[in-house]
Amino acid sequence: RKAGAIFIAKTNTPEFGLGSQTYNPVFGATGCAYDPSLTAGGSSGGAAASLALHLVPVADGSDMMGSLRNPGAYNNVIGFRPSIGRVPGEPGDEQFYSRLGVSGPMGRNVEDTIKLLCTMAGSAPFDPRSGFEDKLDVDAFRPKRFDEVKIGWLGDYGGYLETEPGILSRCEAGLAKMASNGGVVEPVSAEFDMTRLWKTWLDLRNWSRVAFWPFYDDPKKRALMKPELNWEIEQSRSITGADLYRAANTRSDWFRALNKLFDKYEFLALPTAQVFSFSKETHWPKSINDKAMDTYHRWMEVVIGPTLAGLPTANVPVGFDDRGRAMGMQIFGRFGEDRAVLELASAYEGIVDWLSIRPKLPS
């Protein structure tokens, strides 16, 4: 508001912001801007769809498990998850141990996303992780020169992640475009036990549901809550202090593993999603390539790596499949290198035309 923003509305989100499919019993499901029969993704599905449809110029949201990145990919817009602390948290948040979610911007292009980030970023006395030394200035951003860029492509973590056919190839085509413009792109291995990282994710995410115990303990309220939230709350009941200690150490080990890669590569890349947008009547994919998903959010495992490391991550578009479904790619850099990530995203935007393909509205 101090920067002159006009707040228009709160767009649709899933119940308690859980899941990358925007549906709830109040407003129903939000359709993708390009095909309203498909999901807009989530949890900022309403924000991404409204952006793509030109209902708003920019939108903000939060991102724990891809809530800015996933709907950005499905609606062919930019979604940016900043470094932890770049945008101050809420005054009542737990500020030290369990920080997974952050607030960030979305835009129809990188320039607008940068402008909103510079408005949102800053320091706050209630957030000890805020107040980066490099104060973001809109006028200081410049598109990266590709001949100065080296990117490590993590892909599906060496076959660990199931991905719908067509996703990896579209990401690789986008990377090839950067390489043809002078960038260096190489496949890399994280050299990490990804099953260990998933266990860490479950423990830390489920533990955060302790805050919902009072709702769960009220039978009338519990009966109204979505089953996925009740499941997470039930899982949180059995998490021990030792589990959290191990999870914290695994998270630190993962951060160090990525920093080793950053010694060689300025940026790393992953797909933004493991499946293309699906029917908005389906709450979540039960399988990918006939492999069963054992939790309601396993199909979004690809986004937890940047989250657990707290790294700045941009979703950029990589095009559409033969059914017209959009997909995106995550580009992320070292902690605190938000500007560099967005400068690479800006350079990439300049060599592809995916963002110019807007939804066709009924006449």
Model features per residue range: what roles?
Residues 11-19, 192-194, 272-274:
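Short, solvent-exposed turn/loop segments enriched in Gly/Ser/Thr/Pro and often Arg
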Residues 78-173, 346, 351-363:
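A short helix-breaking turn/cap at a secondary-structure junction
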Residues 130, 199, 246, 278-300:
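Short, surface-exposed loop/helix-turn segments at secondary-structure junctions
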Residues 2-123, 307-328:
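Short glycine/serine-rich loop segments
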Residues 1, 143-155, 204-259, 271-276, ...:
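Short helix-loop capping/hinge segments that flank enzyme active sites or metal/cofactor-binding pockets
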Residues 329-335:
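A short, well-structured catalytic beta-strand-centered motif of the EAL phosphodiesterase domain
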